[in-house]
Amino acid sequence: MKKLVILRGNSGSGKTTVARALQRKIGFNTMLISQDEIRRNMLWVKDGIDTKALPLMIELLKYGNEHSDIVILEGIMYDEWYN
């Protein structure tokens, strides 16, 4: 991974929309990691300090580091929970 772009913000602020548009604009070899996609659709877990989504997000970031030029990580990711 040559670059990591992190988009954080409140619910409904447009993070996912911006992240998808950015991925389309950059194009090839860009990985998008969505906190909600992992938490809600892949794992069906709640967000919180001990969320089971965090270890998978970390593994996906490691994968992106090895295999992608740019990784976009987007989600609410509260400071207290995702330090």
Regions found by a protein language model. Name each.
Residues 10:
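P-loop (Walker A) phosphate-binding loop of NTP-binding proteins
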Residues 7:
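Hydrophobic anchor at the beta1->P-loop junction of P-loop NTPases
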Residues 13, 17-69:
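Conserved substrate/cofactor phosphate-moiety recognition/catalytic segment
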Residues 71-75:
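Short catalytic-loop micro-motif centered on adjacent basic/acidic residues
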